[in-house]
């Protein structure tokens, strides 16, 4: 669903966009090693939408496949499109950060995040 990589002289930033988990994350990680920041969606997921939105269990897998140094999550805490509680993605992210030892940036709505 239209992911892209921004490469500057000092950083590589990968923006996943909407999309489910598959082998493309591993392929991107191999093709573009040393990704500094991966921006991954987390929210508005549903088993029926797993091809167009990352499921919580797949976000950590995608992050590890990309081998990104840091992860920032987006696509959460706005309005309820899916049936999960609006704050469930943030709760899941904090658990993943601890369980999977991910270096995550978890911005609140409107928070400025230096890259």
Region roles according to the model:
Residues 1-17:
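Conserved beta-strand hairpin/beta-sheet module of binuclear metal-dependent hydrolase folds
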Residues 12, 22-109:
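Cap/insert and terminal regions of metallo-dependent hydrolase folds
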Residues 110-115:
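A short acidic, often aromatic-flanked loop/helix-cap motif at beta-alpha or helix-coil junctions
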